[in-house]
Amino acid sequence: MSTLVVRTIQTPDGSPVSFPNGIRIGTAIGAGTMNNIGTPGQQGFGVGIAPSLPTGFSKLYGTEDPTSDTYGNYQTTDGSVMCYIPAFYYKFGTGANGYALNVCDIKPFSYFEAVASAAAAGYALHRAFYNGGSVRPGFFVDKYLVSKNGTVASSVKNGVALASATRTLATTPYSSIGQTDNYRGSIGVAKTRGSSFHAKTIFQNSALALLSLAHASAATGSTYCAWYSATSTNYPKGCNNAALGDANDATIAYTSDGTTGVTGKTGSANFLAKTTHNGMNSGVADLNGLLWETTIGLTSDGTNYYLLNTSVDVNTITAGSTLATDAWGATGLAAMYTNIGATYGALTASNSNKPFGSAAQVLSEATSGTAWAMAGAGIPLATGTGGSNQFGNDYMLDYRPAEMCPLVGGNWSNSVYAGVWAVYCNNVAGTSSDDVGCRSACYL
């Protein structure tokens, strides 16, 4: 008989802990253990098992099986499928910190006792896992771009993606579910599923991109990374060649959604795993192409860039430009954001396209401060552009408009410039476009 003595159980930030699914005891590590992001390059990496579930969430058959296509996937009451992304630490390689330049190592949330001990080892907890002033164990994010489901924006396979403007069909604009037809409307779109949901942040998007980068570096074949390439295209593929396929992979074929003739249905690729962030059917689909996606968390007043504070609960952010809770406007900027100045790294308001990647260091290795937060937003260092295959040569549009609303991923015709790192900073919140949609997310 074994004896277990437990004095304290708490999260690294001291917040309450509950175990509705019980506690697993054993020596297993990696995919298949609770709240574990897995091992880069291996089966199950990039998603995981949630330690508890918000109201309205349920498991799918296979949710807790790392060999399953639905591993780490959950369903909400409206039928939406969401992927659970457990919190993780990362170390971005500088060539002098134990990892080769621009190689990223990932460790699960449980690997370090606390954020401080991780930082002492050169690892940072990703910015995506801070919300409302506390460290969160993970977040759920839509597996697919949202589509109309009555009056709800749902994440379902083979949907016709909603957009901020009509795309031929009356079922495509946000207004078809009672929301505003512009980029700021994505905040209301997310809330159609419930008050605990929010529009995907730029930090959450960057976390998915970083996981794909780490997976690419560690993979040695396509067994657990379907989009793997030993040469020049080692990154997720998508609907981006204006012909329902991918500019870098001629085997990809999407099903038309019946709008433009070149826009695919959500998650409809014939090889789904080639279009997910982790190269497996369990991952988040269509981050490269299909439709641009709005994000919140980084904006501008036309003079300076502003970064959302970790103290802000993104569930409380509103879509206007006058209130202290508004994502845009002077009052909201003063209440919720930090002014990081007129430039940061490769963001210099040069009004130009800057391809992602470089032979020099691309992202900061910082474990705290502005450099850490901007790396968490997926913004490269001044040395981090010029283009490289490692980062897909994805495009960053370097602008600084007032009420900036960054778009990520690319659309159905952006070709090689689309990708998981692509970010366009030339758009404002009040704009609308038929090739710009969104995803919802929910913190645990």
Can you annotate each of these PLM segments?
Residues 91-97, 148-153, 416-417:
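Short, solvent-exposed loop/turn elements at domain surfaces
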Residues 27-95:
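GGW-centered surface loops in extracellular recognition modules
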Residues 203-206, 228-248, 252, 256-260, ...:
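C-terminal, surface-exposed recognition/capping segments
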Residues 14, 88-91, 145-148, 204, ...:
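Acidic glycine-/aspartate-rich tracts in secreted/extracellular proteins
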Residues 1-34:
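Intrinsic low-complexity, repeat-rich intrinsically disordered segments enriched
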Residues 301-312:
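A short, polar/charged loop-to-alpha-helix boundary motif
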Residues 78-79, 106, 111-287:
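Short aromatic-cysteine micro-motif
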